[in-house]
């Protein structure tokens, strides 16, 4: 990937790396991809993000039915970020399922009036937050948020598929030398695809 040159990050009006859900005309099942920079795809081209690879695999499985996955990953986002986005968009998109690649459990959001701060690596509160927390507490918080997203999905009869960032392996790096590269994204997509295929049993 490092030899392929600069990556262009094309975003819609809401700063998501996908088409605008409000103007999309896909006449088929729609899905939402949630997570942090590993979902957004920092360091890889749009075609190499796991959500794009997953969409292609799903489309090949059901070629007669158009499929759309909206990549709503937010760099530096937390599980709280994913929940907020899901809560605000699920009624609009009405997804068949939601794919969640969990962000690190220690991250948080601070919402004050119309301002949202993402407490992640590099934030002034990051080290303090880490010092007063523990891996057990972070895991519990992440579990609470995933359950909240599951409840949100259940209200709209959508399935929730979860891939935990702590249980995945990064086999390569992207252009930035830090985030997962194309091969890693293929593995993420493969995992989500197996969940989707097992649940919906699609036929060609």
Q: Predicted regions span which residues?
A:
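Short, hydrophobic alpha-helix immediately C-terminal to the catalytic nucleophile
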Residues: 52, 83, 186-190
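A general structural detector for well-ordered alpha-helical segments in enzyme core domains, enriched
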Residues: 50, 85, 145-149
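Short, well-structured alpha-helical segments in soluble
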Residues: 83-94
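Short, contiguous strand/loop micro-motifs
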Residues: 41, 136-137
